Amino acid sequence: MASSSILIPPILTRRNLLLSTTIATVTPPPPAKPPSPDITITDRVFLDFSLCPTYFRSDPSATLSSTTPCSDSTPLGRVVLGLYGRHVPITVSTFKRMCTSSSTSYKNTPVHKIFPGQYFLAGRQGGGRRDTAEVGYSLRDLPRNTDVVNSKAFLLPHARAGVVSLCLSENDDDDDIRLDPDYRNVEFLITTGPGPSPQLDGGNIVFGTVLEGLDVVTSISSIPTYKPSENIKQFNDFAEFLGDERAQNARSLWNRPLKTVFISGCGELKVTNPSLSPTLP
């Protein structure tokens, strides 16, 4: 006759009970998820883009904001931007001012670089003259942007087309301008898609989104740009290794549009209830 095995239940002593209770008590709860950035749209601005068949080279004594730099321009369309004023208030305030100021503004300044399938850059600072076609270097009255030292300002990703971001890692203002104690960064980028641009994440501050005119953004991204050959790139790398300053000057021409695209108008759009949450993904 086969012997049957008998299972003896474990003896729960007072010591084991106390130990298990203590372990359950000191086990830390899972860390709380940090709150998501507030991307409520607090303001709306517009940028009108136009195409000029020639470069801004005539009458270099006139400032960009005083006259129209291109008499035979072709309108490309209007882009309406929603701005995240609760997320990065100083960045948004500065951008709004650059869109509405009657003196120094984005008006009549170019899209100076285009990276197809990724983004384009605008708002580069220069002499504010037609021969440079850049934002005038007179921004000392703008507030210092403390958003750039707030780690939370860098949390939003460049995950789709139509993301508006303050250029930091991609900023290409001249070094002598950036080293000025009164320097104010107003250069911005807009992602063009079709996919995300993760290389921009963590190094630039997302402060808005395209609400209308994404087709205009797409048309700008399709404009041909200057692309150096591989031989030129290798020669440039070697020149930079030798410390030749001309290498950096030459690289500033890369990815420049072969047709002049400029911001022909800009301003703020007043709405009855501007505090909206974006519906874009």
UniProtKB/Swiss-Prot annotation:
Q: How is it modified after translation?
A: S-nytrosylated during the hypersensitive disease resistance response.
Name the PROSITE patterns on file.
CSA_PPIASE_2
What positions does the domain PPIase cyclophilin-type occupy? Answer: 66-268
The protein's enzyme class: isomerase
Primary site of residence? plastid
Q: Which cysteines are joined by disulfide bonds?
A: none
Residue interval of the organelle targeting sequence = 1-24
Function per UniProt: PPIases accelerate the folding of proteins. It catalyzes the cis-trans isomerization of proline imidic peptide bonds in oligopeptides.
Q: Which protein, by its recorded name, is this? A: Peptidyl-prolyl cis-trans isomerase CYP28, chloroplastic
The gene behind this protein is CYP28
